[in-house]
């Protein structure tokens, strides 16, 4: 089966902002933390006379510096004090995620060390001076944002002069130990500038970045395989929110690609379906962990919250993948042929083959995977439930029959027992 050939591209500028938005959803009381750290780091870099390219890299690092954080419990550690006790886990995780993502691997080393004390970082011999400076700047910028958010604002929502002095005092007290001294000096100068504080708002920060978009990420737009690398990063961030949904996106992606091959789709369409599987649940980053982990039946309000993840997915994907078929294939995974699905209530004539394939694949994988309220189902039970949904006119019969005909390998892919599908 063929679809119009398209060169799938992902906008790396928007990817970095979507990572920041995704991390806001993990549990920060103060949203736009990534935006503010990016802005603080960039502003300080420019004051120090860094090159525009290096300052732009600092901005990008600020947006994604906490990409290794997935649960509220990890955030709680970072937000308990000026000097948090445990930071290595999310730094290492962020490093691993970025190192494996070719379009973003330039950011891996600075993220690995972005909570490392300057005394220790300055002695490391296998890290470039630029990466050391970037790590040190992100560390300092992150702690500036912690300090300004941890103290009360004035009655109009502005940082008080007293708090500016307090922040500068804390930074100076730790210069040469926690923080790189010359960066502390420049940061303290910056803290006295009213415009610096007044411009620290999400809309101003995004407008600022649009002025240097062409050096923000290199290349700005990437092709299908690079898009898949980015999608794999997002899938790991999404799946890590819950041990019960861990690897769900990855397994859906692999199974969708395998079934597409069996159904005669072109190699490019198969890869696009793999991409769609990876990103279909990206909207779940905004779903509270308490709902994802709930072992009991959901209330109406909680179910409504679950349902909105499909819409949140669509909006995020529209920002990153402009006018791509992949957006619909991923975002339609809870639509049903009889119109009973969500969030749009689409019917059969509005759902193309790939959208139907992802929907069936998502249900099959979810049934075979353990969830808070039940253990993973057997292959026989899973097929029985799927067949009932097909008979009721909700799911596509052709995709179901393909799964049924290749049931053993589909079950192994779905449960993670076989990551490499047999040749189509």
Q: Each PLM stretch: what is its role?
A:
Residues 2-424:
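Histidine- and acidic-residue-rich, metal-dependent catalytic cores
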């Amino acid at each position: 089966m063929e679809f119009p050939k398209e060169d799938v591209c992902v906008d790396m500028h928007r990817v970095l902002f979507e990572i920041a938005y995704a991390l806001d959803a993990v549990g920060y009381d103060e949203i736009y933390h990534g935006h503010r750290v990016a802005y603080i780091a960039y502003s300080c870099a420019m004051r120090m006379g860094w090159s525009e390219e290096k300052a732009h890299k600092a901005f990008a690092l600020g947006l994604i510096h906490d990409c290794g954080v997935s649960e509220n419990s990890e955030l709680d550690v970072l937000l308990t004090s000026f000097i948090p006790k445990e930071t290595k886990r999310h730094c290492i995780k962020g490093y691993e995620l970025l190192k494996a993502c070719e379009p973003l691997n330039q950011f891996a080393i600075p993220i690995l060390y972005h909570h490392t004390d300057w005394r220790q970082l300055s002695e490391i011999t296998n890290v470039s001076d630029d990466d050391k400076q970037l790590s040190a700047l992100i560390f300092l910028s992150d702690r500036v944002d912690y300090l300004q958010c941890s103290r009360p604002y004035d009655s109009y929502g502005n940082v008080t002069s007293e708090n500016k002095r307090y922040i500068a005092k804390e930074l100076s007290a730790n210069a040469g130990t926690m923080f790189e001294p010359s960066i502390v000096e420049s940061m303290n100068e910056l803290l006295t500038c009213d415009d610096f504080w007044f411009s620290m708002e999400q809309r101003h920060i995004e407008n600022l970045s649009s002025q240097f978009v062409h050096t923000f990420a290199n290349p700005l737009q990437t092709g299908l395989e690079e898009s898949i690398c980015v999608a794999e990063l997002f899938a790991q961030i999404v799946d890590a929110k819950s041990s019960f949904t861990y690897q769900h996106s990855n397994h859906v992606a692999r199974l969708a690609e395998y079934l597409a091959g069996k159904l005669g789709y072109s190699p490019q369409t198969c890869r696009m379906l793999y991409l769609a599987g990876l990103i279909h649940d990206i909207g779940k980053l905004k779903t509270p962990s308490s709902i994802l982990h709930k072992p009991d039946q959901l209330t109406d309000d909680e179910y409504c919250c679950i349902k909105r993840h499909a819409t949140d997915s669509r909006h995020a994907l529209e920002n990153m993948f402009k006018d791509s078929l992949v957006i619909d294939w991923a975002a339609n995974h809870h639509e049903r042929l009889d119109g009973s699905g969500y969030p749009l209530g689409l019917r059969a004539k509005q759902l193309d083959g790939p959208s139907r394939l992802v929907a069936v694949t998502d249900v099959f994988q979810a049934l075979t995977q353990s969830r808070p309220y039940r253990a993973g189902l057997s292959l026989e039970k899973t097929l029985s439930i799927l067949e009932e949904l097909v008979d009721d006119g909700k799911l596509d019969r052709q995709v179901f029959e393909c799964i049924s005909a290749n049931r053993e390998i589909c079950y192994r892919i779905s449960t993670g027992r076989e990551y490499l599908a047999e040749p189509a």
